[in-house]
A protein has these predicted regions:
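Structural motif
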Residues: 41-43, 72
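Glycine-rich nucleotide phosphate-binding loop and flanking beta-alpha elements
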Residues: 32-33, 50, 80
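Residues in flexible loops and secondary-structure boundaries
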Residues: 23, 34, 42, 55-58, ...
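Walker B catalytic acidic pair
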Residues: 45-49
């Protein structure tokens, strides 16, 4: 927008608001290069691909000087049940079920879009549970084709169930 463009300076990898010394840019995937950050907002994508908890730990501790920091994580399900992604998934389920004290759960917002345990993953009636934008950004015909292929090629099933239906797999 013109109003936003007037306030934000753009470079190749950074958006900056110079009067407030604020910036938004991609960070290294190497946690050892993340010391000294002062984070107000961080978006962490594809948490299931993180090989360890170090990046998220660094971002969490880098919010200490902020009154209302926000760390936003988005991911599909993974396959490593010992990963930081799985730990955050299990914490999220507990928060959503009310199984955590409110002072622990209240700062944690979770939205999990997945098919239910016991659902037939090949049934088109359940696909929208894991794909809230089904028919908009996720094309029904594409999803149907991929699921039909996975039904016939069992080696594809874990990937489709994990990446398209958000089920944890082995």
């Amino acid at each position: 927008s013109p109003a936003l463009s007037a306030r934000v300076t753009r470079t190749v990898n950074t958006l900056a608001v110079l009067p407030t010394s604020s910036w938004f840019r991609p960070l290294s995937a190497d946690a050892s290069k993340m010391d000294g950050l002062n984070v107000h907002f961080a978006a962490v994508d594809e948490v299931h691909e993180h090989t360890g908890p170090e990046i998220i730990q660094k971002l969490n501790t880098a919010t200490g000087a902020r009154r209302q920091p926000l760390i936003f994580e988005i991911t599909t399900a993974g396959h490593d049940r010992h990963s930081v992604c799985r730990q955050h998934h299990e914490f999220s389920v507990k928060a959503l079920e009310g199984a955590l004290p409110h002072e622990t759960a209240d700062p944690w917002f979770a939205f999990i879009a997945t098919i239910d345990e016991g659902d037939d993953w090949t049934d088109p009636a359940v696909w929208a549970k894991a794909n809230p934008s089904l028919g908009v950004t996720v094309k029904i015909d594409d999803l149907k084709r991929q699921i039909d292929e996975a039904r016939e090629m069992p080696a594809q099933q874990n990937a489709i169930r994990r990446l398209r239906l958000n089920e944890w797999t082995e």
